[in-house]
A protein has these predicted regions:
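Signature for phosphate-centric chemistry
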Residues: 1-54, 58-231, 235-248
Length: 248
């Protein structure tokens, strides 16, 4: 069984993440620097001269640091840029809108399907045979084996965001079938969470109506002003799917 070796690695991950949950990883910082580099090189006319760059972030430190890495990179290419940055609750109504009605719809719809979906897609027995010498005992004594499987899969996926663990592969603890099924389950969860579906009365895309309106308003202003400029927003991946659905 490979459980002891896996546990040793996970203890290293736990130590590295101590009081750092939700922060920007080292690879994440580099990714934002590279994104900013590609933006500057692919659209030099936008960032020419003393162009105004308005950068907004949510109030989460990971997003603030993402913004800092991006704008510092842009400033390095063109010191003349007039960059303003902000991260305030004032902007959260469009940067990361919290819709209580959507929350209720999502929770209610998912709970009616949760057990059936987990039983269909999450089968931890094979994983437990890989990890434990006595897999039957483990299945009987590990609380919520399906949650254990999901949590382990999430940690393994996040390890590739850190240089310390980028060459450590624990995906091979899972069979190809396990990986496929967890991926399918997560896709279904995202469908409940953010998709345009009758199960949630097609409300989820409209959570991002304020953000889309902000896109349109700032774009209109830029066109009317007739000057090269950029508006950058640093938020959360959970916004992307409902926004894409809303934009059609």
């Amino acid at each position: 069984a490979r459980g002891k070796a896996a546990l040793a690695t996970l203890k290293e991950v736990d130590a590295a993440s101590y009081k750092r949950l939700g922060e920007l990883s080292d690879i994440g910082a580099e990714q934002h620097q590279r994104i900013a580099t590609r933006m500057y090189k692919n659209y030099p006319e936008v960032f020419a001269g003393d162009a105004a760059v308005d950068a907004r972030s949510t109030v989460v430190i990971r997003c603030i640091l993402s913004m800092q890495n991006a704008v510092t990179t842009l400033k390095g290419f063109n010191p003349q840029l007039r960059i303003t940055t902000d991260a305030s609750e004032h902007d959260m109504y469009f940067m990361n809108y919290d819709d209580p009605v959507a929350k209720r719809l999502r929770s209610t719809a998912y709970k009616t399907q949760e057990k059936a979906l987990k039983d269909k897609y999450l089968q931890p027995k094979r994983l437990f045979r890989t990890l434990f010498t006595d897999s039957k005992w483990a299945m009987a004594n590990v609380k919520k084996p399906q949650k254990f499987m999901l949590d382990l899969f999430d940690v393994v996926g996040n390890m590739q965001s850190h240089h310390q663990f980028e060459n450590v592969d624990l995906y091979n603890l899972f069979s190809e079938e396990d990986r496929l099924k967890v991926w399918e389950y997560n896709n279904i969860r995202w469908y409940f969470w953010a998709g345009s579906t009758p199960l949630t009365k097609n409300r989820m895309p409209y959570m991002e109506a304020n953000l889309l309106r902000n896109f349109i308003t700032t774009a209109d202003k830029a066109i009317l002003d007739g000057k090269n400029c950029a508006t950058l927003r640093f938020g959360h991946e959970s916004v992307v799917l409902p926004l894409v659905c809303l934009m059609g």
